[in-house]
């Protein structure tokens, strides 16, 4: 589970990571993970420090490839994308040959909303339990604290937003370049944002105040 909270403890210098990415012949399949462990600095003891890096989700995809009956790609398409009715998307291939997990996937806004609803509905979509509710609860929990203002679960961020001098909880999926799925449990609201801008800090601060006044808390 540490790889899903960005606490694998693997530390590889950027120049060495570039060498690994360029050595495509020797990082196919599970050899990618082997290369990570061969080239990392010594891994510290638990609890390990949070480090936001592409290595940890790459290992997660390798684990998925090892445990599902088919390939990770086939499993994701059959058990998630098809059941969410997501047909138009781009999910690039990693150098390992597996689906790229750190970044790079592209979907329509309407399909990003479906991912948000899947989480909001505790793993259910169209009446079918696609992901166990207990896993969704843990994934969106504050399992570690990368900073004073943000906590982190299994690839989900959590922070507190200020709305007219009142606090509200917010869970987010944050993608490169300003791709967001915001979940506001108290208001029962899912918001999707797409953009091509670097720097997500201002949006995280301003969006709740502009959207949530129109959606009072449901409890």
Predicted regions and their residues:
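Solvent-exposed loop and edge beta-strand segments that line ligand/cofactor-binding
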Residues: 43-52, 99-106, 173-180, 198
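Active-site-proximal binding-pocket segments
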Residues: 76-77, 81-140
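Solvent-exposed loop/turn segments at secondary-structure junctions
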Residues: 10-11, 57, 96-99, 123, ...
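Structured C-terminal helix/loop/strand segments within mature extracytoplasmic catalytic/sensor domains
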Residues: 173-219
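Charged/polar, low-hydrophobicity segments characteristic of intrinsically disordered regions
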Residues: 1-6, 89-102, 145-159, 219
């Amino acid at each position: 589970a540490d790889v899903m909270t960005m606490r694998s403890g693997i530390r590889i210098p950027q120049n060495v990571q570039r060498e690994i990415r360029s050595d495509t012949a020797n990082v196919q399949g599970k050899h990618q993970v082997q290369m990570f462990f061969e080239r990392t600095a010594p891994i510290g003891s638990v609890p390990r420090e949070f480090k936001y890096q592409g290595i940890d989700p790459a290992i997660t995809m390798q684990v998925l490839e090892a445990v599902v009956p088919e390939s990770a790609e086939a499993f994701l398409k059959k058990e998630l994308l098809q059941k969410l009715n997501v047909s138009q998307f781009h999910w690039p291939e990693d150098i390992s040959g597996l689906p790229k997990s750190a970044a790079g996937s592209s979907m329509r806004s309407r399909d990003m909303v479906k991912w948000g609803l899947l989480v909001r509905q505790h793993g259910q979509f169209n009446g079918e339990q696609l992901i166990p509710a207990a896993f969704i609860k843990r994934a969106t929990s504050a399992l570690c604290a990368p900073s004073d203002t943000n906590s982190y679960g299994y690839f989900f961020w959590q922070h507190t937003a200020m709305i007219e001098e009142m606090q509200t909880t917010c869970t987010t999926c944050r993608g490169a370049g300003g791709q967001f799925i915001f979940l506001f449990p108290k208001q029962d609201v899912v918001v999707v944002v797409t953009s091509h801008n670097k720097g997500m800090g201002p949006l995280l601060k301003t969006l709740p105040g502009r959207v949530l006044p129109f959606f009072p808390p449901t409890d």
